[in-house]
Amino acid sequence: MIIRSAYLEGTVAAADRPAFDAHMRGPVMAAIATYPGLRDVRLRELARGEEGAPAVYMVFDLYFDSLADMDAALASATRQAVRATIQMGMRAFQGRVYHLVFSESASTAAP
């Protein structure tokens, strides 16, 4: 399993958070869900940061079966539509966005 994580590192002014969060949870999640080959998309919002941790506001995790599937999705016409939807809400965000790609190598359920 391949996981492409988009980190939004920064802040959103308190007055803008409800609209920003609603845009990310609604239109952005719906747009991302249209990527070809996507198995799952999850949105993680910071519950608490530890001392010294970067100020990550939220993370989108996109799950694909393979790097080839991820690359095909990112090369598709869908990507431009997703980017446009994301950009509509980004005026409220102060910071940077970066991506990391992980391969899931182990998993176990807690007893």
What are these regions (language model features)?
Residues A33-R39, A53-A55, Y63-L100, P111:
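An amphipathic, aromatic/His-enriched active-site/gating alpha helix that lines ligand/cofactor pockets
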Residues A47-V59:
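Charged, often glycine-rich, active-site loop that binds/positions anionic groups
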Residues D21-R25, A75:
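Amphipathic, non-transmembrane alpha-helical scaffold segments
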Residues E45-A47, V101-E104:
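A general secondary-structure junction signal
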Residues M1-G10:
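Active-site-flanking beta-strand signature of metal-NTP-handling nucleotidyl enzymes
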Residues A14-F20, A68-A72:
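Short, conserved charged micro-motifs
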